[in-house]
Amino acid sequence: MGKIAPKSTRSAAVSQGKILYCENDVNEMDEQSRVFEGAGYTVERVQGKPAAVEAFRNGTYDAAVLGHTLTKDERHHLAYMAKKSSEETQVLVLHASGKHPAVDFAIDSRKGAEEVLEVLNMLVQQKSLALAL
């Protein structure tokens, strides 16, 4: 069963955006979360699909990052849940193949943390521009 991990202590005032990051593996989540937080994002970390579903029901996010330790089925379902909670939420799937209608961008997580961060920055900027119009 999934559980919600402690939230980042970063102030929302300096945040680049609020992201929900979901993985099944806590160590992987901790490592990648540090990269996102270091870039100025407020990160809500959740472990497993049940915790992510709960988070989508109770919160709104600029982006959702679905990690590579989730199963293909979990990533597939959670992408829909992210969009159901808010059409404006950008969905980034790590280590995915193929195109899913609810996924805004998919990237091979083996590309490295900096490339993942670059894509996340692009997605959050796109959301900000779309909301400004």
Predicted regions and their residues:
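Non-catalytic signal-transmission and effector/linker regions of two-component phosphorelay proteins
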Residues: M1-N24, H100, K111-L133
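Conserved dinucleotide-binding and phosphotransfer motif residues
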Residues: G38-A39, S85
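Conserved N-terminal glycine/acidic-rich loop preference
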Residues: Y61, T69, P101-S109
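Acidic, metal-coordinating helix/loop segments flanking the phosphotransfer/catalytic sites
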Residues: R45-A63
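Conserved phosphotransfer microenvironments
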Residues: D62-S86
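Short acidic active-site motifs
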Residues: G48-A52, E74, E115
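Conserved acidic segment of CheY-like receiver
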Residues: S15-V26, Q32-F36, A64
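A short, hydrophobic beta-strand element within the central beta-sheet of small alpha/beta folds
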Residues: A79-A82, E88-K99, I107
